[in-house]
Amino acid sequence: MSAARSTSGTAVATTGAGAPEGRPLDEAFFDRSVHDVARDLVGCGLRFGGGGGVIVEVESYHADDPACHAYIGRTQRNAVLFDRPGLAYVYFSYGVHNLLNAVCEPPGSAAAVLIRAIEPLWGLDAMIERRGRAQPRELCSGPGKLTEAIGVELRHNGASLLEPPFEVTARAGGWERVEVVSAPRIGISRGVEYPWRFCAAGSAFLSRPLPRS
């Protein structure tokens, strides 16, 4: 582990892979099987609101999946899920947190990847201020913590992830060799048997430790 440091002097332990400067992702990246996109998003960069980092944990959801919002069909709330790939699907969870998802597959498919955690690398001071007195490893280690840290709100539902204010970039630097492991999804009551949680192996920034094999 190495450490990034905010201007306030707060050290943040990192994997040592460094801050990647990959190329921006395009719509074709998201216009694929949601499970392939989920696995490939691990190690990619995510920036928004003056903060961001590298995606280290995601989960995939599809309309045929009982845990997916689209399982019950199209509604006003989930309409963005049925739109084009590369859009942000943001929803308010349990009246507490905004959660950020990336819409995937061709229009009408209703599939998305939930961004569960990032390793914070950019704009540490801004994220620390938004999160309060959070410990560095707690800044973005959960889908609600993440959106609070970078400032994603419900009004960003339907925004494109392919253009400002979002910036999602391909794996670069040491992250091109990231090992991705899968496990059952967490925080849901249906579809718990599917191994559609994808994480960067050995990351200290996951929302919850991976189960022991």
Please tell me what each predicted stretch does:
Residues 2-213:
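Conserved, well-structured core segments that form or line functional sites
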